[in-house]
Amino acid sequence: GMIYNNFMFSIQRLANFNRDVVVEGAGMGMVETMCEKTNGLAEKYLQDKPWDDVEIGWLSILGYEGYLINPIAQDQWQSAVNFTEGTLSISESGTTDQYTLSWASNISNQWYVGLGLNIPTMSYTKRVSLQETDRINSAELKSMYHATGVGVSGTIGLIYRPMQALRIGASFQTPTAMSLTVQTEGDVHT
């Protein structure tokens, strides 16, 4: 018969995403990157509700609507400003944790059975700010990416002891099914 049952609850931190980076210097290249991303795109596509078109990158839209890039040909773009100094700031935060509820049993000192239910959770935020200036003008590009999620997975294990000196075991862990919610934002101030 059943000799004992054990129940366990645990919390484990799987990842920590906290870090901050600041880089300063000349020629950061925000507007040049906007031009490169926009080359090949005619101005008419940026004039009428470009946010509704998933084929148009948000850097192109922000550069155009922030008056940082100008068309020079039908589908070629150049910088409308000449920034010389820049500061890039990146801030990341968040964690991935796992909550586990487990059960184990000893049956007749011959069968050992274990079951586990794992619930991983995650939260991650990345904020980026790129500021560029010259003596007269300045621009700041800000972006934010935020993801949260929760998932589920299971484990099962079995050990058979046919004699005192021999144990045969097997275990199986399911893949984790996870649901994520992602939010992004971007804006430019000139």
Which role fits each region the language model picked out?
Residues I3-T190:
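Outer-membrane beta-barrel porins/channels
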